[in-house]
Amino acid sequence: MMDFGLSDDQEALQRAAREFLARECPPALVRETAKTADGVPRALYAKMAELGWMGLVVPETDGGLGLGTLELALVCEELGRAAAPGPFLGTQLVIAALLRAGSKAQRRRWLPALLAGERFGALAYLEESDRHDADGIALAARRTRDGWRLDGTKLFVVGLPGADVLVVAARSGRRGISLFLVETAASGVRVRPAETIDVTRRVGEVRLRDVALERDALLGKEGAAWPMLAHLLDLGAIGIAADSLGGAERALEMAVEYSKVRQQFGRPIGSFQALKHMAAEMVAEIEPSRSLVWYAAYVFDKTPAEAPRAASMAKARLGEVYSRTVNRAVQMHGGIGFTWEHDLHLWFKRARWNEVAFGDPPFHRDRLAELDGY
């Protein structure tokens, strides 16, 4: 049975993460990083790596902390609270792919640099069809004498252009889906940043034109990668849901703090009933959402068969809760809440991207209904 609370060690991890990010990742750093070419605050990620965050779920034998997805979700939650920039989640998905299907040689090549915060990764799966299932994958992989050739385009790759290695989903043959490790510096790979509303994290498009890969670029078995890709997409959905939870909590805190100092008619605006009710509605939505996120992260490790359903519940719920929470926070601030000068807009815009990343709420509700046989 799951204990509906965190262990002492988990609470300590979350508390330490919150304190670290409050100190090392203030809004000023988020703004500065938004102006850089790749959107990666490397000094911050070096410190995160020293804390072991890049290898939270990696076994100790491979240089990690040997923790679970719930601990990873707690760190994602705090990254969302800080609106932290950089390719953390994308790198975790590449690490998860290596742990699940990587050969010893692939692990030796990539894990040390990824865990040290020296290299970063991203999952490239979404295409022009905007589908999150196997039928949406058209990028072609064909065998050659020396290995493979890849042709196609991936859109909205979270973590580009800062990623060094991609896990690319490709169609090999008529029905098979295969995953490949592709370096962004390889010949024939073109990365183009994509503009989105969210300035706190980067997204890009990657075009592969007759990209030659060696045999050992294949992750796992040829044509049998859809279950693993679905596993990675569930992990991505849980990570984004956790990020949304932390962001919603921070937006609520900012709104309440502002309502205590902003005066109207000789009294703090937080004393007015309408704003009290608005804050109460925010709390009432956030608190039960926390259980969905933690449960999804818990069953991802403990009861994998339940993970798709739990991931969709968490992602569908948190996508909307985060957006509604920041909307209300902006209303409580008035017009200043959406100006560039006020930090709240960073969370407002991040919420919009989180809502659609790894499947929007309608997609996950449809998926949940299908999983439940409706």
Which functions belong to the PLM regions below?
Residues W110-P112, S129, A138-A140, K154-V158, ...:
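A generic local secondary-structure boundary/capping motif
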Residues H132, G136-A138, F156-V157, E183-L218:
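Flexible, small-/acidic-enriched active-site or ligand-binding loops
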Residues L99-G102, V168-R171, L181-E183, R207-R209, ...:
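Short beta-strand-to-turn element immediately C-terminal to the catalytic PLP-Schiff-base lysine
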Residues L67-G68, D133-D135, G159-A163:
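Short glycine/proline-enriched turns and hinge-like loops at secondary-structure junctions
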Residues D133-D151:
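Cytochrome P450 C-terminal beta-domain/meander region
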Residues M1-G86, A101-Q106, A113, G117-E118, ...:
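Alpha-helical interface subdomain recognition
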Residues T153-R190:
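A short core secondary-structure module
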Residues G117-E128:
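A short, Trp-centered hydrophobic/proline-enriched beta-strand micro-motif
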